[in-house]
Amino acid sequence: MAETGAPLIRLRGVGREYPSGEGVLRVLTDIDLDIGQGEFVAVMGASGSGKSTLMNILGCLDRPSSGSYRMDGREVARLGAGELAALRRETFGFIFQRYHLLSEMTALGNVEVPAIYRGLPADARRARARDLLERLGLGDRTGHRPGQLSGGQQQRVSIARALVNDARVILADEPTGALDSRSGDEVLGILERLNAEGRTVVIVTHDPRVAARAHRVVEIADGRIVADRRTGAPAADPGPGPAQAPQPAPQPAPVQAPVQARVQARAAVPVLGRLAEALRMALLSMRAHKLRSFLTMLGIIIGIASVVSVVALGEGSRRQVLQNIAGLGTNTLQIFPGRDFGDMRSGRVTTLVTADAAALARQPHVASVSPTVGTSATLRHGATEASAQISGVGEQYFDVAGVALTQGRGFDEADVAAMGQNVVIDENTRTSLFGDGPALGQVFMAGKVPLRVIGVAEAQNRGPGGSTSLTVYAPYTTVQARYLGSTSVSGLTLRVADDVDMALAEQMVADILTRRHGTRDFFIVNNDQIRQTITSTTQTLALLIAAIAVISLVVGGIGVMNIMLVSVTERIGEIGLRMAVGARRGDIRAQFLIEAVLVCVIGGIAGILAALGFGLAFERMSSDFTLVYSPLSMLAALASACAIGLAFGYLPAVNAAKLDPVKALQKG
């Protein structure tokens, strides 16, 4: 607590020095100064005398290298960064020679900034800021940006900003230095009225005429106080006038509350509310630098679009491959004569016969079996001729191989037993022979054998570009007797029961046929193994391409970090101003971190839209292949964008939060 009768501000033996080469530069030496509540003090000195450094120490923007500074009885040197921010936010109001207004914000928005960090509700602080501007004669300029205001108007905006938190102490650094004489007199008149209301006003100036308006002048030269005198200036009449400052509005902390209580008191500032304000300010910054923001997020757009498109491409490829393999049947084994594909002696192997199919069909692990034989023939219908593959199969083949019928029916056991001439043709054959006309019931010649159409099956093995081969499915007995003149078959297609392991079933089939033939003169193709191998290969390729796309995403993140680091340098003055009006280091860090995340999220959304656009264009160019987009991959892409914003925005945000407010204001 403050000592009874103690001054509001007390400095004893305060010195400030900076490293300079191998030595130090002493700017202030043994400063002893007391300033009471309600005083109007001018600190006057030539350029380089140390007066601005003294003001920075008074306003807790800088720390003394030596000595003691007590504010309302509390030692300032013992305050942490957060407590100093609270002191600047709740006790001091700063007026700068160069105004330090944020160019992307309106006059009203600039005045609101300190109240944002104090945690006032949006409606309350907006009403407070508007009232201040109206009382300072800027009621019709609340929506103007700094570039649309004169110097005097900008300085009045900065005065309103200093008052929005009902500051007890006004610190003005050369407040009239950049103004004409009339505007300067208006500003000094406002400061006099503020002092008349009971506020402590400290002006830093080099102009004796400005200093003469104060009640007390402290002269400083070469870092030392050389004079401290009263001027005898009369107190200002706080009567009505266009430049009259507003009466203090009720605030969370009373005007006369001691600093210790004000620093320790913490307003109930909802975290979400502060984050919402940081988000709003980030949007304002992005809108003020549209091209830079777009170029920053361009790398993210490309990276996210690449990742989403590659995932969609991989899923589309996987489904296309599985669709093609589905033509081979589900849970199927195919048995062929010979040692393997390309066996020169396979044509002389005649031991694979229909009796093998019957033997396998009796096994409990086998759902169905169909012998297969094949030949080719020329089809004729009217004046139309076409070459086709004649596939001799059993009545169960369509179920075994998963061939779907689009019209009619398949042949039955009676057709197989009677070597009947009822056949099923595929869609390609139907189109080739009959065009758009009816196919069911039509008779055509296959070589010298007349065949009647009883069903139409979907075309098989449709990959990119489609298949143009013609296929006729006939009873295998018909093909053996009427085309081949042999009882052997070219293969067996077997469907395994759903609850049986494919590898075990393959081994059991091999054992049965080996016993029947006396040797292993056949080989087995496990379609599920092919499916798994191709699916695994497709996924591996998709992961490889996705890894390349992720690299582009990381490069985009590095670009975000680079631009944000540049942004910190460009906006160093803004950072200093925000700290001066009470922003915590966490507030600065959150603002830049949210800005980085926002850039990445907007870039991520744009990247997803770009990927969807690419998919539509791709479908127009290739109707046989479709990119399959996954909502999960899109959510993962947005999550990745957020993570990249957090990861690559952290360093710039930390750098911004570590800035010294004095150095930031000087460089800005």
Swiss-Prot record:
InterPro entries reported for this sequence: AAA+_ATPase, ABC3_permease_C, ABC_transporter-like_ATP-bd, ABC_transporter-like_CS, MacB-like_ATP-bd, MacB_PCD, Macrolide_Exporter_MacB, P-loop_NTPase
Topology within the bilayer: Multi-pass membrane protein
Domain ABC transporter: 9-247
Record Gene3D superfamilies: P-loop containing nucleotide triphosphate hydrolases
Any Gene Ontology CC annotation: plasma membrane
Top EC class for this record: translocase
Taxonomy, superkingdom: Bacteria
SMART domains listed in its UniProt record: AAA (SM00382)
Region Disordered, annotated ranges: 230-257
Cellular localisation: Cell inner membrane
Statement: the UniProt record of this protein carries the keyword Hydrolase: no
Subunit-structure text: Homodimer.
Functional summary from the UniProt entry: Non-canonical ABC transporter that contains transmembrane domains (TMD), which form a pore in the inner membrane, and an ATP-binding domain (NBD), which is responsible for energy generation. Confers resistance against macrolides.
Family, as annotated: Belongs to the ABC transporter superfamily. Macrolide exporter (TC 3.A.1.122) family.
PANTHER family, A to Z: MACROLIDE EXPORT ATP-BINDING_PERMEASE PROTEIN MACB, MEMBRANE COMPONENT OF TRANSPORTER-RELATED
Name of this protein: Macrolide export ATP-binding/permease protein MacB 1/2
Gene: macB1
